[in-house]
Design a protein with these regions (language model features):
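Flexible coil/loop and intrinsically disordered segments
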Residues: 1-201
Length: 201
C-alpha cells in the first residue's frame, strides 16, 4: 500500500494524505485486499451523508474528486494541482460557481459539490463574488476554461436549480472512472500500474 499512499501525496497533496490516514484509522481502508476496493470504500463513506463539500476537512475529498476526474479526462494536459506558493498555500483552490453571497444563511445548496470547481488562485481572486455570466467572461481567456470540470462555464447560464444535476453528474463521472476504468485511472492519474498492485501484499 506504500505506493498508493505515495501517489496520493504526489497527486493530491499532503493535506489529502493526512486526511485519508485519519479516515483510515476509523474505517481500516488499508486492510482491504486491493487498491480499487480501498478507493471505492473511501468514496462510498465520504458520500454517505455529505451535503457540505467545502468546509473544514471536507475540502480534501472534494479536491480528490475534482483532480481525479480532471486528470483522467484530460490526460494530455498535465496540471500540478498540488503546486504551492512561497507561503506553502495551494495555488489551485475550490471556488463557488454561484457566489456564496447569493445564498441565504443555512442554504445547503451553497456548498454542494455541484456548486464548486477548481480554479487558479489568481483567477479566483478576480471573480470570487461575481455572478455566473461575469465569471464566464473572465474564464474565456484562462486555461481553466478548457478543464472538463469547468464545462459548466460553456453553458449560457447556471442557476441554483442546476446544482443537484451537476453534483450527480460529477459523482457519476467518478463512479465510472473508479468502477469501470480503474486500470486506466491508475496509469493516468496515479501514475502506477494496477496489475502490479498485488505485489505489495
Amino acid at each position: 500500500m506504500d505506493r498508493l499512499l505515495y501517489s496520493f501525496k504526489t497527486v493530491f497533496g499532503n493535506g489529502f494524505l493526512k486526511y485519508f490516514k485519519e479516515q483510515d484509522k476509523k474505517h481500516k481502508y488499508l486492510k482491504l485486499d486491493d487498491y480499487q476496493k480501498v478507493i471505492q470504500r473511501f468514496i462510498e463513506d465520504e458520500q454517505l451523508f455529505r451535503t457540505n463539500y467545502y468546509s473544514g476537512t471536507h475540502v480534501h475529498f472534494t479536491r480528490f474528486l475534482f483532480v481525479s476526474i480532471e486528470n483522467f479526462k484530460n490526460n494530455d494536459r498535465t496540471i500540478n494541482f498540488t503546486e504551492l506558493d512561497h507561503k506553502d498555500k495551494l495555488i489551485w483552490q475550490l471556488e463557488h460557481i454561484i457566489p456564496k453571497s447569493k445564498f441565504e444563511p443555512g442554504d445547503s445548496d451553497k456548498n454542494k459539490l455541484g456548486n464548486l470547481t477548481l480554479l487558479h488562485r489568481d483567477t479566483n481572486v478576480k471573480i470570487s463574488d461575481e455572478n455566473f455570466v461575469e465569471k464566464k467572461k473572465v474564464l474565456l481567456d484562462k486555461d481553466e476554461s478548457k478543464f472538463y470540470i469547468n464545462e459548466v462555464f460553456r453553458e449560457d447560464n447556471f442557476e441554483k436549480s442546476d446544482i443537484d444535476k451537476r453534483s450527480s453528474d460529477l459523482i457519476n463521472d467518478l463512479g465510472k472512472i473508479i468502477n469501470d476504468n480503474f486500470d486506466v485511472y491508475c496509469k493516468r492519474v496515479l501514475d502506477i500500474e494496477y496489475k502490479n498492485f498485488e505485489d505489495d501484499f
